[in-house]
Design a protein with these regions (language model features):
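Residues lining hydrophobic/aromatic ligand-binding pockets adjacent to catalytic sites
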Residues: 1-219
Length: 219
C-alpha cells in the first residue's frame, strides 16, 4: 500500500486537490486515490478532531497508520482514536530519539496488545539501534514489532520484522532508486504481512506518490 504522511496540506490545493474542494471533503478525495495514510502526531493535538467524522467522510479507504504523540494527552486521544477506527486502524509508528525508559516500555506493551507497532530508530547511533532492538525484543517478543526503513541499502533487513513493514521516504534520486526501493519491499511481502510505503514531506511530493503507484503496478 502506498500513501502520504497527512492529508491536510495547504499546498496540495494547487498540486492535488481541486481548488474548490471543501476542506472537510479532502480526506474522502484522498481516500479515492490512495489506500493508506499516516496520521501525523500533531493532528492529535486538535481538541476538535473527530475520528467519527473521518469515517463518515470516507468509505473503506484509506486505512490509517498513526505516529505516536509524545504528549500524554495527545497520546490518550490517539489511543482512543485508533480504537474507534477499528479494522481501518493499522497501528502506531513510534519514533525513538533515545533509549526508551521503563515507563515508555510499559506504554508500548499496552499498545502492542491491540495494535501493530513500528519503531523508527533512524536517529539513534548504530550501537544504540542494536541496544534498542534487544530491549524491544525482550519487552515485546521476537518479531512482534516492525522497524521503519528509509530506503537506505544497509537497513533493508528491517523490512522482514513484524506483522507490518513500513518504509518512509521523502525523495529519490531517480526512477532507478524508486524501483530498487519498491522491489525490495515486494521481496519481503507475503499474505500474512502488510507492506506500507509512506511519502513524507511538507507537503509530500505528489509526483513521487504517483510515480510510486505506477512503478508498483508495473512490478
Amino acid at each position: 500500500m502506498i500513501g502520504a504522511c497527512g492529508w491536510q496540506h495547504p499546498r496540495w490545493l494547487e498540486e492535488f486537490y481541486p481548488e474548490d474542494l471543501p476542506a472537510e471533503w479532502q480526506l474522502g478525495y484522498y481516500g479515492n486515490e490512495y489506500r493508506v495514510v499516516l496520521i501525523p502526531a500533531e493532528y492529535w493535538q486538535d481538541v476538535d478532531l473527530s475520528v467519527e467524522t473521518w469515517l463518515e467522510e470516507t468509505d473503506n479507504s484509506p486505512l490509517f497508520l498513526s505516529e505516536w504523540p509524545q504528549d500524554r494527552v495527545a497520546g490518550e486521544r490517539a489511543r482512543a482514536g485508533m480504537h474507534e477506527l477499528g479494522a481501518r486502524g493499522l497501528g502506531f509508528v513510534i519514533s525513538l530519539t533515545q533509549m526508551p525508559a521503563e515507563a515508555e516500555i510499559g506504554i508500548y506493551k499496552e499498545l502492542a496488545g491491540g495494535h501493530a507497532l513500528v519503531f523508527d530508530i533512524g536517529e539513534l547511533s548504530a550501537q544504540a539501534q542494536e541496544s534498542a532492538l534487544g530491549l524491544l525484543t525482550q519487552a515485546l517478543g521476537e518479531n512482534r514489532f516492525g522497524i521503519c526503513w528509509h530506503g537506505e541499502p544497509q537497513g533493508q533487513a528491517h523490512l522482514a520484522l513484524g506483522p507490518l513493514a513500513l518504509t518512509r521516504i521523502s525523495a529519490v534520486k531517480d526512477h532507478k532508486e524508486l524501483r530498487r526501493i519498491i522491489q525490495t519491499i515486494l521481496e519481503q511481502s507475503n499474505h500474512h504481512r502488510k507492506m506500507v510505503l509512506i511519502v513524507d514531506g511538507d507537503p509530500p511530493d505528489i509526483q513521487l506518490l504517483q510515480n510510486a503507484g505506477i512503478m508498483l503496478d508495473l512490478l
